[in-house]
Swiss-Prot record:
One of its GO terms (biological process) is regulation of DNA-templated transcription. One of its GO terms (cellular component) is cytosol. GO terms for molecular function: DNA binding. The lineage of its organism: Bacteria, Bacillati, Cyanobacteriota, Cyanophyceae, Synechococcales. This is Probable transcriptional regulatory protein CYA_2259.
Length: 249
């Protein structure tokens, strides 16, 4: 998972640049709309909405844009484009399994765009369930400003977390997805800087990609999918050496 995690970190570092293009704000607005629609329109009483709002604020989204998205989700703002959540699955170069979460107001458009992204790198969009069995859902909490990994490990155990990965001053805490709010709230109360808390698909097995050309195609696929406005999250089970990853980033 290290290769995919490295790609995810690179993607987060580019977030503010993407936001200037409007792509990230579109994705974040949709996440807020759906979260507000599926629960209470109050971030304090809706963990999914609160997480979406915090992520939007971290990306620099204006408060009025956030409020408008919440209003759309709660039905207090005219919105003639109802969104639905869809999952796509397929195989990329080198047999890498790819799972995509999307929010769309047009299934046909989104499916066509996702299929094209796969076909351009020699991959293929598959049927529902073709790769999801290679992943498991986990709650993942991203932290920054970590100075004492041992103290954090104890806090994670107290909170009910399952695993911890630290890289420099950044860390990722893994837990049962049903305990995500509990663990994230505990860590915040303990003074840790929670950058993001979300349910993610974590690969159970990995595909090691060593060929530079194949690795380049895999990363190209990830970028193309991530740049689609309808796509919210992209997960894959590739493992690429960090040096190779950095040379291609």
């Amino acid at each position: 998972m290290a290769g995919h995690s490295k790609w995810a970190n690179i993607k987060r570092q580019k977030a503010r640049v993407d936001a200037k293009k409007g792509s990230l704000f579109t994705k974040l607005s949709r996440a807020i709309i759906v979260a507000a629609r599926n629960g209470l329109p109050d971030p304090d009483a809706n963990f999914r909405l609160r997480s979406a709002v915090e992520k939007a604020k971290a990306a620099g989204m204006p408060a009025e844009t956030i409020e408008r998205a919440i209003a759309k989700g709660s039905g207090n703002w005219a919105d003639d484009s109802p969104l639905e959540e869809i999952r796509y699955e397929g195989y990329g170069p080198g047999g890498v399994a790819v799972l995509i979460e999307a929010m769309t107001d047009n299934r046909n458009r989104t499916a066509a765009e996702v299929r094209e992204a796969f076909s351009k790198v020699g991959g293929s969009l598959g049927e529902s369930g073709c790769v999801s069995w290679l992943f498991r859902q986990k709650g993942v909490i991203s932290l920054e400003g970590v100075t004492d990994p041992e103290a954090l490990l104890l806090a994670v155990a107290e909170a009910g977390g399952e695993d911890l990965k630290v890289e420099g001053t950044d860390a990722e805490v893994y837990c049962d997805y049903t305990l995500l709010e509990q663990v994230a709230t505990y860590l915040k109360k303990e003074g840790y800087q929670v950058q993001e808390a979300a349910i993610r698909w974590i690969p159970s097995t990995e595909v090691h990609v060593e060929d530079p050309e194949t690795a380049k195609l895999v990363l190209t696929l990830m970028e193309r999918l991530d740049h689609l406005d309808d796509v919210q999250n992209v997960y894959a089970n590739f493992e690429i050496d960090e040096a190779l990853m950095e040379s291609l980033a």
